[in-house]
């Protein structure tokens, strides 16, 4: 059995006002670094990964580094795990894009499977790229546990394929910062055991701040 742990990076800078962050190389916030430590400790305690792969972007590399330190194994960059390419919308503010291209902006949030970003990717491109990443992980890590640290868009693309869901379901799958998605693959059969699991973050927040801390925002 091959186990794949899909992890989203921790919280990043540049989230207010909301932007199409995509491939903007943003650093983790202090909160994001705490989230990375929390998910790292949980992975080290619950599983024994033999490999850690990350997106080339700093927020994933930093999250992967925390997991690497906790588990005692190195990380490798896998370009197929890079965030979606928003093209001309890269790091533009939501409100400004909505004002300039209202129809396409609305389409992205209602019919994402029909959208190609100007000079960027479509969901079809993203799914093809992540499918290749999945093949590589399964080919080189038979009967092992592998960690892949990526982005909400990448994790959604993985999960849509594994759950045999249409691309129109993109927004149905929430991915919080430093969440865990656990997938087992046995003889080509897939079992998704957990999605968007953030129990480790709640426990860490309670330990640091006591009861009443609000839940982590989806950024």
Q: What is the meaning of each model-derived region?
A:
Residues 10, 152, 198:
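Active-site metal-binding loops of divalent metal-dependent hydrolases
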Residues 104-125, 218:
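Short glycine/proline- and acidic residue-enriched helix-loop micro-motifs
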Residues 29, 33, 57, 98, ...:
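Amphipathic, non-transmembrane alpha-helical scaffold segments
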Residues 3-7, 144-150:
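Beta-strand elements within well-structured catalytic alpha/beta cores of enzymes
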Residues 13, 59-61, 83-85, 154-156:
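Short, active-site-adjacent cap segments at secondary-structure transitions
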Residues 54-55, 128, 149-150:
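Short beta-strand scaffold positions
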Residues 2, 8-73, 77:
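Active-site-proximal alpha-helix that buttresses catalytic centers in soluble enzyme cores
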Residues 2, 73, 84-98, 139-144, ...:
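Acidic, low-complexity terminal tails and accessory targeting/binding regions
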